[in-house]
Amino acid sequence: GKDAIENHFDRSLELQIVLERQGKQEQLREIERISELASFSYIRQKEPLGLGHAILVAKALVGNEPFAVLLGDDIIDAEDPCLAQMISAFERYQSSIIAVQQVSRKETSSYGIIDPKPVEDTIYQILDLVEKPSPAAAPSDLAIVGRYILTPEIFDALEQTPQDEGGEVQLTNGLRVLLRTQTMYGLAFHGCRYDAGSKLGFLKATLQFALKRPDLAPELRDYLKMLSLGEVGATMERDRKEN
């Protein structure tokens, strides 16, 4: 549940005492490091009324400052973090920045798609946004990914945004309202995105990041090689018979 997020970035006195007694200094240092990454505040969206509504719930906390929105379903692996790339673009343009990624035409109906005007190598001025268009109706193949840097004007725009047929306030619709008064940019970031909202995407992300860990990678690679050679089933069957 949502408590797991808060607990992950908090300290557990009971756990720290256990780790200290067991002499597990490395694990102890790790949980202390995580709790010091930033100062965290939490606001809950009491009803599932859309991403735009969720952002509105945070209005009092954000105040009159630009802020970032990161959706957990999108996991991005990049040497230069995606958000760092976006902050660099924001510092140049001083306007809302949306992360975008090229997708195949047949996938446009699964994403918000921008109508782009090229500005520089990876930067596009956004002329319009269309939510989940058919391949024929899509203005481009540049899809919105779950990373945004938004200016506080988005709050007024969201308050002017009508609910959709499902009773939700959609961020894409709010961004279209904001486009009336603000130039907005899309950044085609450098990095690999995984859709953790799908089972396969979640598995791919888990494997990719596990293969980057020195404590897991060697044995995991061996296991994956066994899978590719069809040896795992035979090994499991042999172990079953022996037991």
Predicted ranges, named:
Residues 5-13:
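Glycine-rich loop at the start of a catalytic domain that most often binds anionic cofactors/ligands
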Residues 14-18, 25, 31-116, 150-152, ...:
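Conserved beta-loop-beta/alpha segment of the NTase-like Rossmann-fold superfamily
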Residues 68, 87-91, 118-222:
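Catalytic-core segments of class I nucleotidyltransferases/pyrophosphorylases
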